[in-house]
Design a protein with these regions (language model features):
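Gram-negative outer-membrane beta-barrel proteins
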Residues: 25, 50-54, 94-96, 140, ...
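Low-complexity, polar/charged sequence tracts that form flexible coils or short amphipathic helices
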Residues: 87, 98-99
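Short flexible loop/turn segments that cap and initiate beta-strands
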Residues: 82-86
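Extracellular loop and loop/strand-boundary signature of outer-membrane beta-barrel proteins
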Residues: 56-61, 92, 154-160
């Protein structure tokens, strides 16, 4: 971890902050204002972040998400709460046994609610969109997924760990 800071006790400028997170570089820059009340405005960037390492500490997600992702997130925080927007993208991800491709998730933070609405991805030959909410206070999450044009057999095989038979056709799910 390395940090380059400048400024005064009232306002610190983060010229550059860098650390390894999940084996990949994560960087941040911005401003921390300490008086009259705490406020942070940070631009956070990460390339090639290991999703399995990053989700290891969350019981509901541990070992369930694998792949490398890129993160862009702009955070604004005050003593009244945090807000932010950004995106997470990945060429391929395995989530809960399912193989996803071309993942593009818009991100937002409002207090303890971390959300991804209208994310898109490719799923077994079809297209899918999602709406995810993660509560930072309780570490619980919910996700809804809508998909169309999906190869049902490939999805069923991966979702179940392998069926004894074969499912034919294409499907839509929500």
């Amino acid at each position: 971890m390395a940090a380059d800071l400048s400024g005064s006790p009232q306002a610190l400028k983060v010229n550059n902050f860098s650390a390894k997170v999940g084996g990949a570089p994560l960087s941040a820059s911005g401003t921390l204002r300490l008086t009259p009340s705490m406020r942070a405005d940070l631009a956070i960037r990460g390339d090639g972040l290991d999703l399995e390492a990053l989700t290891e500490g969350f019981p509901d997600l541990k070992g369930q998400i694998k792949g490398k992702a890129n993160l862009v997130f702009d955070l604004s925080g005050t003593d009244k709460g945090n807000t932010g927007t950004g995106s997470l993208s990945a060429p391929s991800v395995e989530a809960f046994g399912l193989r996803l491709a071309n993942v593009k998730l818009p991100l937002s933070l409002d207090g303890n609610a971390f959300k991804s609405s209208n994310g898109t991805l490719e799923l077994y030959g079809g297209k899918a969109s999602n709406s995810l909410t993660f509560d930072l206070k309780t570490f619980k999450f919910s996700d809804s997924l809508t998909a169309s044009g999906v190869d049902v057999n490939a999805l069923a095989q991966d979702a179940t760990g392998g069926l004894g038979g074969k499912v034919t056709g294409q499907g839509s799910l929500s």
